[in-house]
Amino acid sequence: MTAGHRRAKHINHNLIEACALNGWAMGVGSQRRELTDPKAAFEWQHLRRDFPEVSLYSNLGIAQLITNPLSDIQRLTDALQANALIIHCNPLQECMQPEGTTHYKGCWQALADVVKNLPLPIIIKETGCGFSRETMMRLNEIGIAAIDVGGLGGTHWGRIEGHRATHDPIRQQAAITFQNWGIDTATSVRHAAELKPSFEIWGSGGVLNGLNAA
């Protein structure tokens, strides 16, 4: 997915059309803006209207899950007629963003509450740094439906924020320092499988060739 620019609607239409042809699901971009501006939902509503048969997943950051009531989360998923909710965990990116939200206290309770009370599968996703064994063990105890490990080696949002910080040399240097920080996708997938969890294991990004896969 993509969002926030003039070609986003066209690109997302092509992506969901590919999903419809191949029987794939599609996760939308972060719905954070919709929490304060319901009109922002227009960016995604045409996808559901034009492709009602595709499984569409809502998407929100864990910081917003902590600071917003469940009723607001439900409003986002209802507006999309979502089939699942992705909670993305991106602490490195948030630390690098000038506008980032770095409040994570209460995240475990917020996750447990949404799993218990929202009538949709909950998917937890990293954004380029992978998950540790300990984190995945705890997520398994909470009862999430799937983990997308989103490990090191693919798109790395910490690096992207460093490139955005053209007038902030401290953030640029921090992005360089952390550019290889994280657990690679293949290792995260292997660690998850060793837990024999109840959740599905998804691996996105960082598997670039047959050697990585092996």
Residue ranges with predicted function:
Residues 34-36, 160, 212-213:
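Residue-level recognition of conserved structural "scaffold" positions that shape functional pockets
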